[in-house]
Amino acid sequence: MAGMKGSRKARRNERGSELIELAIVLPILLLCFAAIIDFGFLFQRYETITNAAREGARLASLPNYTVADVQGRIANYMAASGLSGGPTPYVNQTATRTLPSGQTISVAEVVVWYPAGMTYLGPIAGLVGASGHGSMMLRATSIMRAEAAASGS
């Protein structure tokens, strides 16, 4: 019976230790979750500009489309995806690339930039006195082989 009394006393001395452990670990977990959410939004923006660049390159690779047409397609795609503004995309419809075989081909190249302003760690950054605001320039490039204009017979 003496052993039972000692274990009860030891258990009584450990009361509240779970709360202290939770108080130590919870802020770290919240920071991790906030970072996952913030970087998820950043990745979504990156995927959007990548797809916009691909749409632009697809149109730029076709004959009879102007740079303004391509830039309009990119702007429409980004607006439909919830992103607006940003610098004018770079479009080069007369670029060339050399294949490993030595053959030179005509390609259309499109580069899209987007300033991704975001709040790092959401409102949690304010709790520790940080502003939590920052911005980075996302960039996506798409290159597609240019199609030749059909010749009339």
Map each language-model feature to its residues.
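Alpha-helical assembly-interface signal, strongest on the long, hydrophobic N-terminal helix that forms
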Residues: 2-78
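Short, conserved structural patches
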Residues: 2-5, 54, 58-153
